[in-house]
Amino acid sequence: MDNMLQFMKLVGQLKRVPRTGWVYRNIKQPESVSDHMYRMSMMALTIQDISVNKERCMKLALVHDLAECIVGDIAPADNVSKAEKHRREKDAMVHITGLLDDGLRKEIYNLWEEYETQSSPEAKLVKELDNLEMIIQAHEYEELEGKPGRLQEFFVSTEGKFHHPEVLGLLKSLNEERARHIAAGGEKTTDTDSLTLAKP
């Protein structure tokens, strides 16, 4: 049980790891990695598509960023190559799952690897949820700051990455709400005429 306690303490670290993208954009009280994964898991829970395994989607959402309790949230702006990022996270996952009994160790590590390699329909869907959760959060920060459009780069970065019908439906609702806020102008700190909404 000592190892299980250490595992749970590592999981708890995710509550204290801020999402780097928000830190770099000077967001006050940025969300943690744990915050992000919780809403992703709730998104997975609400998926109604019977062609995918909902339980597996939830598990993938819960473990996909687990390595960040050790390596931190490595953002594109950190200029770390994909190969190096994967190496660091793989080493972290070997350590983290090594605290668990063999069955759990294999299950959690294999879930992480499945997400990393995008080797299943569930992993591909959860990747879409990952991107969608990010831009929902970006929209919420724009609302909280009263600066519609300030975090446009996050929306641009997801263009062409959404395909699942349920994800597209939620994206449509998000785009419509955000368009209204941009039209209203907020504090007009951004040239909203040049903005585009997130694209499928």
From Swiss-Prot:
InterPro entries, per database record: HD/PDEase_dom (IPR003607), HD_domain (IPR006674), YfbR/HDDC2 (IPR039356)
GO molecular-function terms, A-Z: 5'-deoxynucleotidase activity; metal ion binding
Cofactor info, note text: Binds 2 divalent metal cations. Shows activity with Mn(2+), Co(2+) and Mg(2+) but shows no activity with Zn(2+).
Residue span(s) of domain HD: 33-135
Record-linked Pfam families: HD_3
Keyword terms, alphabetized: Cobalt, Hydrolase, Magnesium, Manganese, Metal-binding
Residues binding a divalent metal cation 1: 36, 64-65, 130
Superkingdom of source: Eukaryota
Catalysed reactions, semicolon-separated: a 2'-deoxyribonucleoside 5'-phosphate + H2O = a 2'-deoxyribonucleoside + phosphate
Binding site for a divalent metal cation 2: 68, 73-74
Top class in the EC scheme: hydrolase
Cofactor(s) the protein requires to work: Mn(2+); Co(2+); Mg(2+)
Enzyme Commission (EC) number: 3.1.3.89
Quaternary data: Homodimer.
Function: Catalyzes the dephosphorylation of the nucleoside 5'-monophosphates deoxyadenosine monophosphate (dAMP), deoxycytidine monophosphate (dCMP), deoxyguanosine monophosphate (dGMP) and deoxythymidine monophosphate (dTMP).
Family stated for the protein in its record: Belongs to the HDDC2 family.
PANTHER family xref list: 5'-DEOXYNUCLEOTIDASE HDDC2
Name this polypeptide is given: 5'-deoxynucleotidase HDDC2
Organism, as annotated: Danio rerio (Zebrafish)
Lineage: Eukaryota, Metazoa, Chordata, Craniata, Vertebrata
